[in-house]
Amino acid sequence: MIDTIMLDAQERMSKCVDATKNQMAKVRTGRAHPSLLDSIQVSCYGSMSPLKQVANVGVEDSRTLTVNVFDRSMVQAVEKAIMSSDLGLNPMSAGATLRIPLPSLTEERRKDFIKVVRNEAENGRIAIRNVRRDAISEVKKLEKAKACTEDDVRRSEDEVQKHTDSSIKNIDQILAAKEKELMEV
Protein backbone atom coordinates (compact mmCIF):
# COMPACT_ATOMS: atom_id res chain seq x y z
CA MET A 1 0.00 0.00 0.00
CA ILE A 2 2.78 2.42 0.91
CA ASP A 3 4.63 1.43 -2.27
CA THR A 4 1.71 2.53 -4.45
CA ILE A 5 1.53 5.86 -2.60
CA MET A 6 5.28 6.36 -3.14
CA LEU A 7 5.06 5.45 -6.84
CA ASP A 8 2.10 7.77 -7.32
CA ALA A 9 3.93 10.63 -5.58
CA GLN A 10 7.07 10.04 -7.64
CA GLU A 11 5.06 9.97 -10.86
CA ARG A 12 3.15 13.14 -9.97
CA MET A 13 6.40 14.93 -9.07
CA SER A 14 7.96 14.02 -12.41
CA LYS A 15 4.81 15.32 -14.14
CA CYS A 16 5.21 18.59 -12.22
CA VAL A 17 8.81 18.88 -13.43
CA ASP A 18 7.74 18.16 -17.03
CA ALA A 19 4.90 20.68 -16.85
CA THR A 20 7.26 23.33 -15.50
CA LYS A 21 9.76 22.56 -18.25
CA ASN A 22 7.01 22.91 -20.88
CA GLN A 23 5.83 26.22 -19.40
CA MET A 24 9.38 27.57 -19.45
CA ALA A 25 9.86 26.43 -23.05
CA LYS A 26 7.02 28.74 -24.06
CA VAL A 27 8.96 31.77 -22.84
CA ARG A 28 10.66 33.32 -25.83
CA THR A 29 14.41 33.66 -25.86
CA GLY A 30 16.44 35.45 -28.51
CA ARG A 31 16.82 32.15 -30.32
CA ALA A 32 14.37 30.85 -32.92
CA HIS A 33 12.48 27.73 -31.88
CA PRO A 34 9.41 26.15 -33.55
CA SER A 35 7.59 25.85 -30.21
CA LEU A 36 7.32 29.67 -30.10
CA LEU A 37 4.36 29.38 -32.47
CA ASP A 38 2.62 26.45 -30.72
CA SER A 39 0.00 28.66 -29.11
CA ILE A 40 -1.13 30.27 -32.39
CA GLN A 41 -4.62 29.39 -33.64
CA VAL A 42 -5.46 29.91 -37.33
CA SER A 43 -8.93 30.55 -38.69
CA CYS A 44 -9.35 28.01 -41.48
CA TYR A 45 -12.43 26.65 -43.22
CA GLY A 46 -14.72 28.27 -40.67
CA SER A 47 -13.04 27.00 -37.49
CA MET A 48 -9.95 27.66 -35.39
CA SER A 49 -7.07 25.19 -35.78
CA PRO A 50 -3.59 25.03 -34.27
CA LEU A 51 -0.87 26.32 -36.60
CA LYS A 52 0.70 22.83 -36.59
CA GLN A 53 -2.33 21.46 -38.48
CA VAL A 54 -2.14 23.92 -41.38
CA ALA A 55 1.61 24.51 -41.68
CA ASN A 56 5.05 23.13 -40.95
CA VAL A 57 7.21 25.32 -38.69
CA GLY A 58 10.99 25.14 -39.04
CA VAL A 59 14.12 27.05 -38.07
CA GLU A 60 16.09 28.74 -40.84
CA ASP A 61 18.78 30.21 -38.60
CA SER A 62 19.13 31.35 -34.99
CA ARG A 63 16.95 34.42 -35.59
CA THR A 64 14.52 33.26 -38.29
CA LEU A 65 11.59 30.84 -38.34
CA THR A 66 10.03 29.50 -41.54
CA VAL A 67 6.39 28.49 -41.84
CA ASN A 68 5.52 26.31 -44.84
CA VAL A 69 1.76 26.46 -45.30
CA PHE A 70 0.23 23.25 -46.68
CA ASP A 71 -2.57 24.99 -48.60
CA ARG A 72 -1.56 28.15 -50.53
CA SER A 73 -5.02 29.65 -49.94
CA MET A 74 -4.30 29.64 -46.19
CA VAL A 75 -1.16 31.83 -46.35
CA GLN A 76 -3.10 35.06 -45.63
CA ALA A 77 -4.91 33.50 -42.66
CA VAL A 78 -1.67 32.12 -41.18
CA GLU A 79 0.08 35.46 -41.67
CA LYS A 80 -2.82 37.29 -40.00
CA ALA A 81 -2.85 34.83 -37.06
CA ILE A 82 0.89 35.28 -36.47
CA MET A 83 0.65 39.08 -36.67
CA SER A 84 -2.34 39.23 -34.32
CA SER A 85 -0.68 37.00 -31.71
CA ASP A 86 0.89 38.73 -28.72
CA LEU A 87 4.38 37.55 -29.72
CA GLY A 88 5.23 40.75 -31.60
CA LEU A 89 6.29 38.93 -34.77
CA ASN A 90 6.04 40.27 -38.32
CA PRO A 91 6.06 37.52 -40.99
CA MET A 92 7.22 38.12 -44.57
CA SER A 93 5.39 36.18 -47.26
CA ALA A 94 7.24 34.35 -50.07
CA GLY A 95 4.69 32.15 -51.86
CA ALA A 96 3.52 29.33 -49.61
CA THR A 97 6.38 30.05 -47.18
CA LEU A 98 6.43 32.68 -44.46
CA ARG A 99 9.73 33.90 -43.02
CA ILE A 100 9.54 35.25 -39.50
CA PRO A 101 12.58 37.23 -38.30
CA LEU A 102 12.74 37.37 -34.51
CA PRO A 103 13.59 40.79 -33.10
CA SER A 104 16.43 40.80 -30.60
CA LEU A 105 15.37 41.15 -26.98
CA THR A 106 16.03 44.33 -25.03
CA GLU A 107 17.62 44.12 -21.59
CA GLU A 108 14.33 45.17 -19.98
CA ARG A 109 12.40 42.50 -21.88
CA ARG A 110 14.95 39.85 -20.87
CA LYS A 111 14.50 40.77 -17.21
CA ASP A 112 10.72 40.55 -17.60
CA PHE A 113 11.08 37.07 -19.09
CA ILE A 114 13.37 36.03 -16.23
CA LYS A 115 10.68 37.11 -13.75
CA VAL A 116 8.13 35.02 -15.65
CA VAL A 117 10.46 32.00 -15.69
CA ARG A 118 11.20 32.32 -11.97
CA ASN A 119 7.47 32.49 -11.27
CA GLU A 120 6.92 29.31 -13.32
CA ALA A 121 9.71 27.59 -11.38
CA GLU A 122 8.14 28.62 -8.08
CA ASN A 123 4.76 27.30 -9.23
CA GLY A 124 6.47 23.99 -10.04
CA ARG A 125 8.10 23.85 -6.61
CA ILE A 126 4.76 24.56 -4.93
CA ALA A 127 3.10 21.77 -6.92
CA ILE A 128 5.85 19.35 -5.88
CA ARG A 129 5.49 20.31 -2.22
CA ASN A 130 1.73 19.78 -2.50
CA VAL A 131 2.37 16.28 -3.84
CA ARG A 132 4.69 15.65 -0.88
CA ARG A 133 2.05 16.86 1.57
CA ASP A 134 -0.61 14.64 -0.04
CA ALA A 135 1.64 11.56 0.03
CA ILE A 136 2.59 12.06 3.67
CA SER A 137 -1.03 12.57 4.70
CA GLU A 138 -2.02 9.37 2.86
CA VAL A 139 0.67 7.42 4.72
CA LYS A 140 -0.44 8.91 8.05
CA LYS A 141 -4.00 7.81 7.31
CA LEU A 142 -2.67 4.28 6.87
CA GLU A 143 -0.90 4.54 10.23
CA LYS A 144 -4.12 5.69 11.94
CA ALA A 145 -5.93 2.76 10.36
CA LYS A 146 -3.20 0.48 11.79
CA ALA A 147 -2.25 -0.64 8.26
CA CYS A 148 1.43 0.23 8.77
CA THR A 149 3.93 0.86 11.56
CA GLU A 150 5.47 4.10 12.73
CA ASP A 151 8.80 3.00 11.24
CA ASP A 152 7.13 2.53 7.85
CA VAL A 153 5.72 6.05 8.10
CA ARG A 154 9.14 7.54 8.92
CA ARG A 155 10.80 5.57 6.11
CA SER A 156 8.18 6.67 3.59
CA GLU A 157 8.40 10.31 4.75
CA ASP A 158 12.17 10.20 4.18
CA GLU A 159 11.66 8.64 0.75
CA VAL A 160 9.08 11.26 -0.25
CA GLN A 161 11.42 14.00 0.96
CA LYS A 162 14.27 12.58 -1.17
CA HIS A 163 12.02 12.59 -4.24
CA THR A 164 10.88 16.12 -3.39
CA ASP A 165 14.46 17.38 -3.06
CA SER A 166 15.43 15.67 -6.32
CA SER A 167 12.46 17.14 -8.22
CA ILE A 168 13.05 20.64 -6.87
CA LYS A 169 16.73 20.34 -7.79
CA ASN A 170 15.66 19.41 -11.36
CA ILE A 171 13.45 22.49 -11.54
CA ASP A 172 16.29 24.67 -10.23
CA GLN A 173 18.61 23.28 -12.93
CA ILE A 174 16.01 23.92 -15.64
CA LEU A 175 15.54 27.46 -14.28
CA ALA A 176 19.29 28.16 -14.25
CA ALA A 177 19.63 26.93 -17.85
CA LYS A 178 16.68 29.04 -18.99
CA GLU A 179 18.01 32.16 -17.22
CA LYS A 180 21.40 31.64 -18.86
CA GLU A 181 19.71 31.19 -22.24
CA LEU A 182 17.68 34.38 -21.73
CA MET A 183 20.69 36.49 -20.77
CA GLU A 184 22.74 35.45 -23.83
CA VAL A 185 22.87 38.27 -26.33
Curated annotation (Swiss-Prot):
GO molecular function list: ribosomal large subunit binding
Chief localisation class: cytoplasm
Superkingdom of this protein's organism: Bacteria
Subcellular location per the Swiss-Prot or TrEMBL entry: Cytoplasm
Keyword Cytoplasm among record annotations: yes
Keyword Ligase: no
GO biological process per UniProt: cytoplasmic translational termination
Physiological role: Responsible for the release of ribosomes from messenger RNA at the termination of protein biosynthesis. May increase the efficiency of translation by recycling ribosomes from one round of translation to another.
Protein name: Ribosome-recycling factor
Species of provenance: Shewanella frigidimarina (strain NCIMB 400)
